[in-house]
From Swiss-Prot:
HAMAP family listed in its UniProt record: CCA_bact_type1 (MF_01261), CCA_bact_type2 (MF_01262)
Lineage per the UniProt record: Bacteria, Pseudomonadati, Pseudomonadota, Gammaproteobacteria, Alteromonadales
Residues where CTP binds: G8, R11, R91, R137, R140
Needed co-factor(s): Mg(2+); Ni(2+)
Protein known as: Multifunctional CCA protein
Annotated organism of origin: Shewanella woodyi (strain ATCC 51908 / MS32)
Length: 413
């Protein structure tokens, strides 16, 4: 019986990255031997055990054989005669197929260390195509390690494309697809996840609403990058720089879905695209089982980003309507999320990545002013029921009008 540290812990140690989880592989052992040592079994589909003291996972070395469709269509053999090399052969990427024994010696039968040195994401074997989930995993690794210079090997991208064309991606559950998207959104470069999925033809299958944006032109005057798909990638990249919140990053990703619906006769203009995109966002979120928190912010950003861009020109009444629609009185955190997503949209344009976005501060300040109106004096003045709400609205419009006047006067000075 031999124990090996495997997978992400070995990879991240070689990359000099923080190690989050440690997974171990056990060669030459049967479940009965693990029980005798005090380990508790937790895996149903294949033997995974928890260490009696550390609670870390120890999996018996195993091989896998494709028996059906999807990422669950496998049977496995975890007998004691499965070798280290056989177990590592079933793994997705060479950088994840390195093992380390208890003396620190590395075992790298498939060239993972060389690929780490050359910054390459490469499949271990042609069995890669048997698991459609690997398309999403590799795209996520590409996003996660992009800042280190990693790219996907051409031959691996070819196998990912083969999976996309096979129809196997349809076997993935909505929950699993969103889980991979959510993990990718939390990386430094989530736009790479979308880019890689597009390169291997998976984007049009998993997220057709996003794929439809590529090739849709925008006015060059406002969008030097022209292509709406490219703009979307740039906005997502900016959102990742401006916010750690995945909900903000998701809103940035889907804020322009309506541009794919613009009539060809009106291109490259996209009148009302924020509103026309709302139905597409709802469809995408329902299909992918996106959390309500993400969906609601995405709908708000799509609906209002044009207004925020032009906020200086809006009437005070319109500003209050935006605050009402966003429910900022009860959910003030949304203000920062909305401002950040709109700033990402503005900066997600070729050559304008470092341009200022004063609209965000104007939005913050105008809401702060409107939110300073107290309801107590209104009640004390004798107003009741619906009258209170109406008076509150009028007072807010009045004070925002004064703020707008003072702001404009100071701008002239």
């Amino acid at each position: 019986m031999k124990f090996y540290l495997v997978g992400g812990a070995v990879r991240d140690n070689l990359l000099k990255l923080p190690i989050k989880d440690r997974d171990y592989m056990v060669v030459g052992a049967a479940p009965e031997q693990m029980f005798e040592l005090g380990y508790k079994q937790v895996g149903k589909d294949f033997p995974v055990f928890l260490h009696p003291k550390t609670q870390q996972e120890y999996a018996l070395a195993r091989t896998e054989r494709k028996t059906g469709s999807g990422y669950g269509g496998f049977s496995c053999d975890a007998s004691p005669d499965v070798t280290l090399e056989e177990d590592l052969l079933r793994r997705d990427l060479t950088i994840n197929a390195i093992a380390q024994d208890d003396k620190g010696e590395l075992f790298d039968p498939y060239g993972g260390i060389k690929d780490i040195e050359s910054k390459m994401l490469r499949h271990v074997s042609d069995a890669f195509v048997e698991d459609p989930l690997r398309v999403l995993r590799v795209a996520r690794f590409a996003a996660r390690f992009h800042h280190l210079g990693f790219t996907v090997a051409d031959e691996t991208l070819a196998l990912m494309t083969k999976i996309s064309q096979s129809g196997e991606l349809e076997a993935l559950t909505s929950e699993r697809v969103f889980l991979e998207l959510d993990k990718a959104l939390s990386t430094q470069n989530p736009q790479i996840f979308i880019e890689v999925l597009n390169q291997c033809q998976a984007l049009e299958i998993l997220f057709p609403e996003i794929h439809a944006l590529f090739g849709v032109p925008q006015p060059e005057k406002w969008h030097p990058e022209i292509d709406t798909g490219i703009h979307t990638l740039m906005v997502l990249a900016q959102a990742a720089k401006l916010s750690d919140e995945n909900s903000v990053r998701f809103a940035a990703l889907v804020h322009d879905l309506g541009k794919a619906l613009s009539p060809k006769a009106t291109l490259p203009k996209h009148h009302g695209h924020g509103q026309s995109g709302l139905a597409l966002i709802k469809v995408l979120c329902a299909r992918a089982k996106v959390p309500n928190e993400y969906r609601d912010l995405a709908l708000l950003v799509s609906d209002q980003h044009q207004n925020v861009h032009n906020i200086r020109e809006l009437r005070p009444e319109t500003l209050i309507k935006i605050f009402d629609k966003a429910d900022l009185w009860r959910k003030p955190d949304r203000l920062e999320q909305l401002a950040t997503a709109c700033e990402a949209d503005s900066k997600g344009r070729l050559g304008l990545e470092n341009s200022p976005y004063p609209q965000a501060d104007y939005l913050r300040e105008s809401f702060q002013v409107a939110n300073s109106v107290a309801v107590k004096p209104i009640i004390e003045a004798g107003f009741k029921g619906a009258e209170i709400k109406e008076q509150l609205k009028l007072k807010r419009i009045e004070i925002v009008t004064e703020f707008k006047r003072n702001f404009n006067e100071s701008a002239i000075e």
